[in-house]
């Protein structure tokens, strides 16, 4: 069973619908025992970094997610959920993240002719391969965000060009992140969720 972590900061209905389209048995949960028992986890997210971390803390989920990852559970963060994977974020001051991938979440710099938030379809540029990146180079996906993940190159898999390279996908071990919304990115996005399902299956041999 795949668990979509529920903490009132994510577009969970669309994520669950997309997972169902690729044959994933998934449900929404904030129950620590269900999260720790899951085969794989998805952390969606929309909104502000500090508010989202507060919602996770209020539910006692920060240490639960960290423990699940330490136990080897695959985790996919989507949009704000990807940003929360980092050590810290600079939205409305400096705030601690989940600390699962080294890096800092920063605001996209203002650039002439490029409004913030970065909103709409953008092409992907492969930097290095991961379990989720096959066939993605040059594909177009849907972004909505004002902040980006500043991570060391070793964790950067895919970028998009928005006046500068913007991290689109990152990963460390069994922790993956998509800055864009795979659930809103048509067949390309569904393909990423399908690859995550396959990765979870290979990781657990029982999904």
From Swiss-Prot:
<comment type="pathway">
    <text>Amino-acid biosynthesis; L-histidine biosynthesis; L-histidine from 5-phospho-alpha-D-ribose 1-diphosphate: step 5/9.</text>
</comment>
<dbReference type="Pfam" id="PF00117">
    <property type="entry name" value="GATase"/>
</dbReference>
<dbReference type="InterPro" id="IPR017926">
    <property type="entry name" value="GATASE"/>
</dbReference>
<dbReference type="GO" id="GO:0000107">
    <property type="term" value="F:imidazoleglycerol-phosphate synthase activity"/>
</dbReference>
<keyword id="KW-0028">Amino-acid biosynthesis</keyword>
<keyword id="KW-0378">Hydrolase</keyword>
<keyword id="KW-0368">Histidine biosynthesis</keyword>
<comment type="function">
    <text>IGPS catalyzes the conversion of PRFAR and glutamine to IGP, AICAR and glutamate. The HisH subunit catalyzes the hydrolysis of glutamine to glutamate and ammonia as part of the synthesis of IGP and AICAR. The resulting ammonia molecule is channeled to the active site of HisF.</text>
</comment>
<feature type="active site" description="Nucleophile">
    <location>
        <position position="79"/>
    </location>
</feature>
<dbReference type="InterPro" id="IPR010139">
    <property type="entry name" value="Imidazole-glycPsynth_HisH"/>
</dbReference>
<feature type="active site">
    <location>
        <position position="181"/>
    </location>
</feature>
<dbReference type="GO" id="GO:0004359">
    <property type="term" value="F:glutaminase activity"/>
</dbReference>
<keyword id="KW-0456">Lyase</keyword>
<dbReference type="GO" id="GO:0000105">
    <property type="term" value="P:L-histidine biosynthetic process"/>
</dbReference>
<feature type="active site">
    <location>
        <position position="183"/>
    </location>
</feature>
<dbReference type="GO" id="GO:0005737">
    <property type="term" value="C:cytoplasm"/>
</dbReference>
<keyword id="KW-0315">Glutamine amidotransferase</keyword>
<protein>
    <recommendedName>
        <fullName>Imidazole glycerol phosphate synthase subunit HisH</fullName>
        <ecNumber>4.3.2.10</ecNumber>
        <ecNumber>3.5.1.2</ecNumber>
    </recommendedName>
</protein>
<keyword id="KW-0963">Cytoplasm</keyword>
<dbReference type="InterPro" id="IPR029062">
    <property type="entry name" value="Class_I_gatase-like"/>
</dbReference>
<comment type="subunit">
    <text>Heterodimer of HisH and HisF.</text>
</comment>
<feature type="domain" description="Glutamine amidotransferase type-1">
    <location>
        <begin position="1"/>
        <end position="206"/>
    </location>
</feature>
<dbReference type="GO" id="GO:0016829">
    <property type="term" value="F:lyase activity"/>
</dbReference>
